[in-house]
Amino acid sequence: KTVWDTAEKGINDKLYGSWSTPVIYRVGDHDEVALSMPGQLKGFDPLTGKELWKCDGLGPSNYPDTAVGDGVLIGVSGFQKSMMAVRMGGRGDITSNRLWHVEMTQQRVGSGVVHDGYLYVSNAPGIAECIDVKTGQSVWKERLGGTLWGSMLLVGDRLYVSNTQGEIFILDASPQYRLIARNAMEEHIKASLAPSDGQLFIRTYKNLYCVGARRK
């Protein structure tokens, strides 16, 4: 049965909305849920559905999940709008207490990941970017090529991301840009890569691949 249901108002009847997955994070001794919504980033109590906080400033269409790390939540608009960060633990309308808010012009589909104080995110036009979590400033921005729809995957200190043309890029998760490898699958890819138990799963248009050390 439905445990709780929270109604949310839409902006208008155009093709605007949220494709973002709710993200659970820990604050002190309890869990909260963050969700990038049309125009806002919001936090909810996962047990009751009660809205705990909200922050204005996102665009009308949001694809990426909220990025979590270093006590910060980062909401990223999907289409030509903004990106912003708030500190965990806020209550009520925290718009005036945003950590930072920056405008952007490139479309983002895949979700980003936070590692050691930096947000790593991909742009649909084929650009990977490293952003300082504390300031929102871009540290590096490099064109990988193709159209990047997949989410950034962090495994250890390496980043993995795929483009729709079927290439998989491996980057160093560092404020100094370094491309480690580029692998061509020769099949279209729109899904994000998925790790499990030392293996990497890759879903293309026609096949599902598992990459890793061969097991006995």
Model-predicted segments: where are they?
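Short loop/turn segments that connect beta-strands within beta-propeller blades
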Residues: K1, D45-G49, R87-G92, D132-G136, ...
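Extracytoplasmic beta-rich repeat domains
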Residues: V3-H30, S36-P38, K54-G69, V76-F79, ...
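Conserved hydrophobic/aromatic positions in well-ordered beta-strands
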Residues: V23, K42, A67, M84-V86, ...
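Surface-exposed extracellular loop regions of Gram-negative outer-membrane beta-barrel proteins
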Residues: L35-Q40, I127
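Short loop/turn segments immediately following the C-termini of beta-strands
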Residues: P38, G78, M88, A124, ...
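Blade-level signature of beta-propeller repeat domains, shared across WD40, Kelch, NHL, RCC1
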Residues: K81-M83, G166-E167, A173, E187-K216
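Loop/turn-rich, solvent-exposed surfaces of beta-rich toroidal or solenoidal domains
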Residues: K81-M83, M104-A173
